[in-house]
Curated annotation (Swiss-Prot):
SMART domains: Fapy_DNA_glyco, H2TH. It catalyses: Hydrolysis of DNA containing ring-opened 7-methylguanine residues, releasing 2,6-diamino-4-hydroxy-5-(N-methyl)formamidopyrimidine; 2'-deoxyribonucleotide-(2'-deoxyribose 5'-phosphate)-2'-deoxyribonucleotide-DNA = a 3'-end 2'-deoxyribonucleotide-(2,3-dehydro-2,3-deoxyribose 5'-phosphate)-DNA + a 5'-end 5'-phospho-2'-deoxyribonucleoside-DNA + H(+). This is Formamidopyrimidine-DNA glycosylase. The lineage of its organism: Bacteria, Pseudomonadati, Pseudomonadota, Alphaproteobacteria, Hyphomicrobiales. A zinc finger (FPG-type) spans 257-291. Belongs to the FPG family. The gene is mutM. It comes from Bartonella quintana (strain Toulouse).
Length: 291
């Protein structure tokens, strides 16, 4: 599933072109994704202006004129791409990026040039909703999201407060979107390795009123920030279906220290990386370095 760095990379790829653009036409190649498209979706969008493209956690927010917002979630395999006429003809001629195109939006940018914005989703777990912009953060999907890991408020102290009395694993708490918005399995594994913390460790141990606990919490918060920022700078991680808005791949997967490296040597101590299952998800860690 695309995590915060992948979604932010998409946002940054689309934003310069679509901000201020007018929606010319909409084509729906099916009636639904994970959920049905909003009623009269095409008719309600044509003629609108895309005022701003935002992100909250793993959600993209296309803020439109007339105070409505398209909330887009990429699901497991969704991707957005943007093409001009020449690039679109090249892709079509090559038969590339045509299958599983479910939503197509033609827009006219502020400079008058026409672009084609396409949503592709092999597994169709993504979805789009059309919401009232003024009340969007009251929607159940957004209302309970935690802090953004790159926000000024995110810190070791915040983590300590969030971990109080949490008897479950550190990995489980870090994946809780009501605590940290947008953080997923890949980047939790990477941040924990950098912090030398086991994914099986009880989260409450970082909330203890000791110097050691505070230092671990500060280190973890900083490493989460660093991993997320680095992944964004590399254009995210491509494991299976994720692509950037120009059709290219992300590159952060080449910088993984533990994720997907079961049996390979730990870069720190040399012993094999271990994979375990936690709540149905794979955790990768070094049993020697991470305690």
């Amino acid at each position: 599933m695309p995590e915060l760095p992948e979604v932010e990379t998409v946002r940054r790829g689309l934003e310069p072109v679509i901000t201020g653009a007018k929606i010319i036409s909409i084509t729906l190649n099916r009636r639904d994704l994970r959920f049905p498209f909003p009623e009269a979706f095409s008719e309600r969008l044509v003629g609108r202006t895309i005022m701003e493209l935002g992100r909250r956690g793993k959600y993209l927010l296309f803020h439109l004129s007339q105070n409505e917002t398209i909330l887009s979630h990429l699901g497991m395999s969704g991707s957005w791409r943007i093409e001009d006429d020449l690039l679109r003809k090249t892709y079509s001629a090559a038969g590339k990026f045509v299958k599983h195109d479910h939503f197509l939006m033609d827009i006219q940018a502020k400079d008058g040039k026409v672009y084609h914005l396409t949503y592709n989703d092999v597994r169709r777990f993504g979805f789009m909703l059309l919401l009232d912009t003024n009340r969007i953060y009251e929607h159940p999907l957004l209302k309970k999201l935690g802090l953004e890991p790159l926000s000024n408020e995110f810190s070791g102290r915040y983590l300590q407060e969030a971990f109080v009395n949490k008897k479950i694993s550190l990995k489980g708490v870090l994946l809780d979107q009501s605590i940290i918005a947008g953080l997923g399995n890949i980047y939790v594994c990477e941040a924990l390795w950098r912090s030398r913390l086991s994914p099986q460790r009880g989260a409450f141990t970082l909330a203890l009123k000791t110097v050691c606990a505070r230092e671990f919490a500060d280190s973890l918060a900083q490493n989460i920030r660093n991993v997320i920022a680095e992944a964004i700078s590399f254009g995210g991680s491509t494991l299976r279906d994720y692509i950037r808005t120009d059709g290219s791949l992300g590159y952060f997967q080449h910088s993984f220290s533990v994720y997907g490296r079961e049996g390979k040597e730990c870069f720190q101590c040399g012993i094999p990386i271990t994979r375990i299952s936690q709540s149905g998800r794979s955790s990768f860690y070094c049993s020697q370095c991470q305690k």
